[in-house]
């Protein structure tokens, strides 16, 4: 069975829903369909269902630019975010465009017809071929099937429950049980207070090394007051602009004055702990924003640690035992449940096998043009959100650019666009930037590479991107456009796997 479509959006998470909404309002002449492998929209916010799941960015910047987040809550629960996305789906009538329980297996671009031939497996596990003019990959950057798990010595000896947050058991009973959470990132610092409040006998956060953690208010009182005296849209725009500036300011200051920011963060944590917990557990060896800065609402993590309901250990695992974890220091952590909050397994485009005329593509040897399109790959965009700000900010600017590009192609009568790569621009760093987080280090052999200069340099700077993409010319000598009747030989060939 073959099906001809115009634009194929892969993924109905926050990126896919955002792209679809922008296309609906900014390029309404283009038709699109959305493929979603799961039964529901939401992506990350449908997959992760562990206790306390929430955003780690403020919702005024995590919400879309076209739809105000109408709540004073700074951070939001996973269910609230799914509800917000459902509203977008309803407002833009997207439900009829989404094909649930459909999975893209492979995609081959045929240069003769200038079409993508996409192999799809439907809910009945029957294979179909969809023929698309343009693809937008909105699958995020991690493997939905499994998270990253280190090789824990003797793990099989453990008689309790071993859980990864990515696959949280429904109705897990942890009341009255001893829980050890391995990790110190956003997931771990969310789980500790949530499981403690949920009735666990004791929760221990076991970390190999400390992480910077900032406490932020759970309610944005300024925004709440503005909403009462200003139109909702204006209050949202002002709050969004303020928070974008604050985010960027903290990140920039961390790069330029790391000692100053470190001193401030550590002093803030010390005030939260009130001498009840040793500061060695919250004093990282790296500088602020060398890894992503984690946040907690109203210092909930520190409150739980002060109360004694939870504790933190900075150590390394010697091995698992039948009853818990033996640490290299000699200490034993008793556990009924162990949660491995050890990060994500990086994966691009949902693991789709991509080819051009049957020849495999290698994204790790490619760059991103304007942070949106893969070098030497025709008629495809890929959404990778910011690592130092809200993911959705990138979705908005990328969607605006994609809509402008498609409108330009329609006006000029073009069927194909290819960002022609310049290998002299290729760097060793990936587009994830200079962060040293474990999951980013593991992305080196998967992620597209950073470029030295624009338009190949991914800035991870929303304000810079918004200006650059809004004003970007399409006749820049890098984008190569073709019509179906064109026979002009391209200057470069797609990057292939040898």
Swiss-Prot record:
GO molecular function: flavin adenine dinucleotide binding; N,N-dimethylaniline monooxygenase activity; NADP binding
InterPro entries: FAD-binding_MO, FAD/NAD-bd_sf, Flavin_mOase-like
Pathway the protein takes part in: Hydrocarbon metabolism; alkane degradation
Positions contributing to FAD binding: 15, 36, 56, 62, 104, 395
Enzyme type, top EC level: oxidoreductase
Cofactor(s), names only, from the UniProt record: FAD
Membrane topology label: Single-pass membrane protein
Source organism, top-level taxon: Bacteria
Keyword field contains Disulfide bond: no
Keyword check for Flavoprotein: yes
Record-level GO BP terms: alkane catabolic process
Residues holding NADP(+): 54-56, 184-190, 208-209, 292-293
Compartments, as annotated in UniProt: Cell membrane
EC number: 1.14.13.-
Note on how the cofactor is bound: Binds 1 FAD per subunit.
Annotated keywords: Cell membrane, FAD, Flavoprotein, Membrane, Monooxygenase, NADP, Oxidoreductase, Transmembrane, Transmembrane helix
Residues that span the membrane, as ranges: 4-24
Any one GO CC term of the record: plasma membrane
Family: Belongs to the FAD-binding monooxygenase family.
Function: Is able to catalyze the degradation of n-alkanes with C chain lengths of 32 and 36. Probably allows Acinetobacter baylyi strain ADP1 to grow on the long-chain n-alkane dotriacontane (C32H66) as a sole carbon source.
PANTHER family tied to this protein: MONOOXYGENASE, PUTATIVE (AFU_ORTHOLOGUE AFUA_8G02570)-RELATED
Protein name: Probable FAD-binding monooxygenase AlmA
Gene field: almA
């Amino acid at each position: 069975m073959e099906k001809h479509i115009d634009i194929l959006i892969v993924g109905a998470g926050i990126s896919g829903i955002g792209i679809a909404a922008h296309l609906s309002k900014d390029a309404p002449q283009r038709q699109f369909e959305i493929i979603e492998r799961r039964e529901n929209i939401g992506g990350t916010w449908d997959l992760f269902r562990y206790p306390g799941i929430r955003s780690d960015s403020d919702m005024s910047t995590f919400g879309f630019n076209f739809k105000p987040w109408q709540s004073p809550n700074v951070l939001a629960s996973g269910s609230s975010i799914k509800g917000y996305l459902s509203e977008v789906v309803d407002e833009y009538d997207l439900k009829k465009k989404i094909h649930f329980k459909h999975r893209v297996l492979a995609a081959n671009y045929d240069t003769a017809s200038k079409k993508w031939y996409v192999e799809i497996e439907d809910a009945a596990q029957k294979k179909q071929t969809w023929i698309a003019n343009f693809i937008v990959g909105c699958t995020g950057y991690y493997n939905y099937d499994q998270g990253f798990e280190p090789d824990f010595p003797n793990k099989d000896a453990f008689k309790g429950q071993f859980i990864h947050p990515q696959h949280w058991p429904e109705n897990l009973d942890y009341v009255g049980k001893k829980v050890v959470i391995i990790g110190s990132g956003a997931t771990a610092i969310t789980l500790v207070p949530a499981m403690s409040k949920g009735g666990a006998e004791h929760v221990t956060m076991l970390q190999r090394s400390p992480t910077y953690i900032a406490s932020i208010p759970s309610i944005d009182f300024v925004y709440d007051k503005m909403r009462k005296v200003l139109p909702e849209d204006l209050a949202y725009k002002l709050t969004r602009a303020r928070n974008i500036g604050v985010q960027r300011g903290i990140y920039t200051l961390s790069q330029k004055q790391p000692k100053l920011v470190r001193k401030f963060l550590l002093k803030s944590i010390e005030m939260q702990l009130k001498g009840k917990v040793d500061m060695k557990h919250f004093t990282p060896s790296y500088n602020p924003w060398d890894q992503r800065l984690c946040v907690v609402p109203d210092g909930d993590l520190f409150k739980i640690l002060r109360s004694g309901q939870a504790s933190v250990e900075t150590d390394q695992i010697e091995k698992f035992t039948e009853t818990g974890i033996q640490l290299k220091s000699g200490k034993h952590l008793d556990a009924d449940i162990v949660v491995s909050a050890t990060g994500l397994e990086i994966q691009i485009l949902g693991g789709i096998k991509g080819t051009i005329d049957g020849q495999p593509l290698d994204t790790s040897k490619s760059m991103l043009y304007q942070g949106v399109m893969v070098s030497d790959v025709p008629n495809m965009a890929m959404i990778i959100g910011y690592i130092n700000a809200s993911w959705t900010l990138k979705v908005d600017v990328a969607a605006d650019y994609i809509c402008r590009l498609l409108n330009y192609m329609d006006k000029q009568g073009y069927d194909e666009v290819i960002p022609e790569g310049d290998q002299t621009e290729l760097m060793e760093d990936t587009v994830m930037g200079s962060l040293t987080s474990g999951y980013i280090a593991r992305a080196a052999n998967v992620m597209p590479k950073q470029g030295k200069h624009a338009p190949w340099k991914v800035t991870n700077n929303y304000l810079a991107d918004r200006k650059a993409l809004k004003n970007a010319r399409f006749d820049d000598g890098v984008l190569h456009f073709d019509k179906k009747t064109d026979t002009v030989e391209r200057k470069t060939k797609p990057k292939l796997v040898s």
